[in-house]
Amino acid sequence: MPFTLGQRWISDTESELGLGTVVALDARMVTLLFPASGENRLYARNDSPITRVMFNSGDVVTSHEGWQLKVDEIQQENGLLIYTGTRLDTLEENISLREVFLDSKLTFNKPQDRLFAGQIDRMDRFALRFRARKYQSEQFKLAESGLRGIRASLIPHQLHIANEVGKRYAPRVLLADEVGLGKTIEAGMIIHQQLLAGRAERVLVIVPDSLQHQWLVEMLRRFNLRFALFDDSRYIEARHDSDNPFETEQLVLCSLDFARRNKQRFEHMLEASWDLMVVDEAHHLVWSEDAPSREYQVVEQLAEQIPSVLLLTATPEQLGQESHFARLRLLDPNRFHDYQTFIDEQQKYRPVADAVTLLLSGEQLNNNQLNLMGELISEQNIEPLLKAANSNSGESETARRELISMLMDRHGTSRILFRNTRNGVKGFPHRELHQIKLPLPSQYQTAIKVSDIMGAKKSLEARAWDMLYPEQIYQEFEGENATWWNFDPRVEWLLGFLMANRHEKVLVICAKATTALQLEQVLREREGIRGAVFHEGLSLIERDRAAAYFASEEEGAQVLLCSEIGSEGRNFQFANQLVMFDLPFNPDLLEQRIGRLDRIGQSRDIQISVPYLENTAQAVLIRWYHEGLDAFEHTCPTGRTIYDHYYEALLNYLAKPNNQDQEKFGEFIDQCRQQHEQLKQQLEQGRDRLLEMNSNGGEHGLRLAEKISEYDNDTELVNFSLNLFDIVGINQEDRNDNMIVLTPSDHMLVPDFPGLPKDGCTITFDREQSLSREDAQFISWEHPIIRNGLDLILSGDTGSCAVSLLKNKALPVGTLLVELIYVVEAQAPKRLQLTRFLPPTPLRILMDLKGNNLADQVEFESFNRQLNAVNRHTASKLVNAVQKEVHAILQQAEGLVETQAKSLIEQAEQEADENLAAELSRLEALKTVNPNIRDDELEAIEANRQQLLLNLNQASWRLDAIRLVVVTHQ
């Protein structure tokens, strides 16, 4: 095409320069000025990477003054274009705009505009865009959204609870599973689901001081949720950025003490518009009708303001009924307003539980029992079900399950209280204790005597604490560099134990970080034993590295030495050898130590070795834990109660281990054991088995775990992810253990890829491997790297237009095919979850010049494999040659896509209407027999249904990508 001064062109390789103007010409070169960027470029007249900008009738163009013109007619005058049409701001007709006066900041957003402007993308990017649309659409519609991407084992009861609660509007529930069953993971899954679904955006997590780090780690490692830890300094720092510091972050974690201590701070917290609050260890909130504690009042006021509340607590049997009622009162004060009414109501549910037990037994039901069933489910005709349940046919089991489901719906608190026990959940290992009694070295004996004399004024508690850790006493007198490890027999025993168990991974836990560091040095220097250290002084990344070093099978550490605080929130199920170098002060910490290995998914029995020094507080404590509480070999739900009750007596025995009457101490142990047995029996009798059945999920939980497990083997995810990393420009380094190291490169599509750390990260597509390797992130469709990658591709114009060659001798050379990808979508607030029914859905059309749609006959992937790439310059020439034909095809395609899109929208409307109407009528029917269904929940479902149908009715479609395919024989 001949050049003329004033013509407008665009650079094929530097589209960010905007619209260029021809300002100089000679026989061989042409100069373009790009006013938007102030740049000049010199190009050869022949074969330059620039494209003439020519708009068509129907296009809207912008003048350099800012007004817009809808083009009706195009004329040429001396090689320059004049656009004539209607000015959109004044509606004047027959207004002319010369191309030289077009806005230089012009960008091409529509795929067809980019194609005609020569901004043609690579073929592989077009394919990636289509796949991204397809996969994203499929993921939105899956019912298990929010559960599939968690970095945790697929435990049925956890999945059931998370699925049941996570999909509710403003859930307010009590999670009261026994220790070790994963309440934190359940809460994390619910948070994850609520965030992904858009039901929550701002989350507040309140935990005890000692659990802050554990929560921070669990939320980040398992759910990729980056909480901001608020303490005094963070609060003060955030005040510089906002009047309300809590509004500077969406996900906030803090301690209960932090929330309680300062009135203004608490007011800021109340005003911060949270969507969801989680309170861990909620059983420590002290309440009585006359005098609720300050901590209880803090949580109560927050719970009144925040729509969704999760309380994590001990089991109801451990709490006692009054304390249990206090937690339920936080969730729904209108429903649980009077304690005695609550007790009376609970008694009424006894027949329901008995009926379920009867159905589960499989025995024939007598007339009295049949009448009882009829009374309990009085609003429905269940005669046919009762007959089937009592028959010997194959329908009996199905009928009994349906009756059980109906009875469960009537159970008072099963909708707001979830509680599982180890008895009801299978998969836990046995625990074996090995006590290693060792002599007390003379050096320690001397140090303890001196400490007794000098510490006479110390409190009983302080002296008891000192006596538990003789190496600390020794260092106090001999200095920090005193080499206690040279004579402490526990060190010799540990060396021998590790040498004898060379092929075992061993977790060693001690109270202090200094002890762990000193032991690692001794093991390394004396026997060359590879060890990693894990303590509170390390950063998250350093802890990850230590954990990964310990987890590695080849060249990994044999032993991981942890301090008490440093081990919080980390689990090492791949190991089964636990050494307690010393003992913690209370039963909760003891269970926490064992819980590092004793988790669901542990495949071997846990071996607990405790080397202890005779005639010391350690000897007292090991006997009390083992003989008094049976706390080593079994979980001890009574531990805290007995500890609190006998606290003073226990302190006396610990503070003076040498001066005790052995007979009296034996009686003390017997007393503790008897109380332990009595409490345990009371707990067992108080178990609500109906509640356990509902919390466990049964078959539903198992099916959910199996279904998610099937997604774990998704090869499409692996192929798509690697393709995405290639095109985005992320470096990939394959490791020989099914892991990949991702690092940013200098040529990425964006300078900072969201979700990818600057120093890179290690990923795996294998769930089990991610669980055994602390440093490996588990990649799923829900991982931020993949979700951000999808958003990056689909929110921009990457791959929105391309040109390819099809080598096919069965078709004439030059045959033109146009592949069009339309997207049908509707806009709605995220909380409505419109994408469950109509996600942005791609519609593919493959047109020939005769107006035939070949998409059904020619599948995308097989077609794509037959195509060859073409360079951008040649592609621009091909586009210019067939521009007229492409416009005609686009017009024909509009009619085709309209029919398909309307059908899709109607389907979505019908599905949404039926789905939400069914949910509403189910809950309305239940409300007649179960008062725990809240009115606001019913109102929200109906309001959502109306709003969803309105939004779906306004759904539209648009062209998202276009590809020209030209047939060649070469």
Curated annotation (Swiss-Prot):
Per the database record, which ranges form the Helicase ATP-binding domain?
A: 164-334
Keyword rRNA-binding found = no
User: Which residues are recorded as binding ATP?
Assistant: D177, E178, V179, G180, L181, G182, K183, T184
EC number, as in UniProt: 3.6.4.-
**Which Gene Ontology MF annotations are present?**
ATP binding; DNA binding; helicase activity; hydrolase activity, acting on acid anhydrides
BP GO terms, sorted: regulation of DNA-templated transcription
Task performed by this protein: Transcription regulator that activates transcription by stimulating RNA polymerase (RNAP) recycling in case of stress conditions such as supercoiled DNA or high salt concentrations. Probably acts by releasing the RNAP, when it is trapped or immobilized on tightly supercoiled DNA. Does not activate transcription on linear DNA. Probably not involved in DNA repair.
Q: Per its record, how is this protein called by name?
A: RNA polymerase-associated protein RapA
- The source organism is Photorhabdus laumondii subsp. laumondii (strain DSM 15139 / CIP 105565 / TT01) (Photorhabdus luminescens subsp. laumondii)
